[in-house]
Curated annotation (Swiss-Prot):
Pfam families, per database record: Ribosomal_L2 (PF00181), Ribosomal_L2_C (PF03947)
NCBIfam families: rplB_bact (TIGR01171)
Family in the record: Belongs to the universal ribosomal protein uL2 family.
Keyword terms, alphabetized: Ribonucleoprotein, Ribosomal protein, RNA-binding, rRNA-binding
Skewed-composition ranges (Basic residues): 259-268
Name the record gives this protein: Large ribosomal subunit protein uL2
One GO location term (cellular component): large ribosomal subunit
GO biological process, any: cytoplasmic translation
Source species of the chain: Chlorobium phaeobacteroides (strain DSM 266 / SMG 266 / 2430)
């Protein structure tokens, strides 16, 4: 996928870039797989902001994605590659031989007309899904389950892939995109290949208005606030943090630079072989 740069006709378009839509083969989504999305603006039912910097944006429909890939033994044909406004990757519409239609994440290199399948003993091919115990070591995978049958939860964004590094007993060892090395049960499923649209990370929004189209509101620096609104607010002029002065903090007083916040008593802690920030 090539990135398309705009001519510097206006200040906003000077550095703006858009993804190329060459791989997209259909402009209208499958209506039977759409559900409406109710926008919250980051508010809970009491009307209070619980997620900051959210609001506005273009109206969207949610595409129901098959993260479980549990339709075993029934081959499917890739009918189209489509744009999904709710995620960074593209999605592929599958037509199964029994007539059912489902969306999946579109891996890199998947073409319209190709066959994909899921099951215990399927071919090692891009787009096929199977348990981790049947995938060869060194294979690039995505849409990985954390619990068998729950559906893929990690490695789902554009250009992401994990590497199957080792297999021992009831667990396999995965190297994740973050750098974390983690164990997962061999019964968990994953899809072969790398998630498509890898150039997404190089896109430049170019102007504030384009963030608003995406539903992202402006972010105010804590130092620019009053003391009542932020631990780093107030002071005469620019009262810097660090160097014996105030340490940077989150709006709720949590130390912001490098403090580990994960609970070490979590049961899944023993499954992390090496953390993502380990040297």
């Amino acid at each position: 996928m090539a990135i398309r740069k705009l001519a510097p006709v206006t200040p906003g378009s000077r550095f703006m870039s858009y993804p190329g839509f060459d791989e997209i083969t259909k402009s209208e989504p499958e209506k039977s797989l759409l559900v409406p999305v109710k926008r919250t603006g980051g508010r809970n039912r009491a009307g209070r902001i619980t997620s900051r910097h959210m609001g506005g944006g273009h109206k969207r429909h949610y595409r129901i994605i098959d993260f479980k890939r549990n339709k075993d033994g029934v081959p499917a044909t890739v009918a189209s590659i489509e744009y999904d406004p709710n995620r960074s990757s593209r999605i592929a519409l599958l037509h199964y031989n029994d007539g059912e239609k489902r969306y999946i994440l579109a891996p890199k290199g998947l073409k319209v007309g190709e066959k994909v399948e899921s099951g215990e003993k399927v071919e090692i091919k891009t787009g096929n899904t199977m348990p981790l115990k049947n995938i060869p070591l060194g294979t690039d995978i995505h849409n990985v389950e954390m619990r068998a049958g729950k559906g893929g939860q990690i490695v789902r964004s554009a250009g992401a892939f994990a590497v199957l590094a080792a297999r021992e007993g009831d667990y396999v060892t995965l190297k994740l995109p973050s750098g974390e090395i983690r164990k997962v049960r061999v019964e968990c499923r994953a899809t072969i290949g790398v998630v498509g649209n890898a150039e997404h990370e190089n896109i430049v929004l170019g102007k504030a208005g384009r963030s608003r189209w995406l539903g992202i509101r402006p972010q105010t620096r804590g130092m620019a606030m009053n003391p009542v609104d932020h631990p780093m607010g107030g002071g005469e002029g620019k009262s810097k943090s660090g160097g014996g002065r105030r340490h940077p903090k989150s709006p709720w007083g949590q130390l912001a630079k490098g403090l580990k916040t994960r609970n070490k008593k979590k049961a899944s802690q023993k499954l992390i072989v090496r953390g993502r920030n380990a040297k």
